[in-house]
Amino acid sequence: MGYTIQLDKDGDYCWDEDPTHHDPYTQANATSHTAVSRAAMAAPHAAAHHAFHEPFIKLNLTDKNIFNGLGFILIVIFIYLLLITLQQMLTRHIYNTVQHCVKAHLDSKNLQ
């Protein structure tokens, strides 16, 4: 099946069937027995092909869902970086506290 891609009035891409494209299944000769069987095969083939391409018929370039998905990913990355920063701060705080306690313990041992 032939398709042309064009922009509609809203600036969105549209897929239209190309009328200049000649499908061998649709070129059936009425006098030939094989052409009749080809024509019988053409309808389900075209229907299945059209149904398969249905989700990709129109691409909306101004769709806000793309930006919503991008925003969600950016928020997840921001939270991940925030958690890494908090974990590093907590680790440094624990390390400094333990170091301070060990130093205080050693100082108290030296005083005895």
Swiss-Prot record:
Protein name in UniProt: Uncharacterized protein B117L
Principal subcellular localization: host cell
Superkingdom of source: Viruses
Compartmental location: Host membrane; Virion
Glycosylation (residues): 29, 60
Membrane-spanning parts: 66-86
GO cellular component: host cell membrane; membrane; virion component
Keyword RNA-binding: no
Assigned protein family: Belongs to the asfivirus B117L family.
Keywords: Glycoprotein, Host membrane, Membrane, Transmembrane, Transmembrane helix, Virion
Keyword Metal-binding: no
Topological category with respect to the lipid bilayer: Single-pass membrane protein
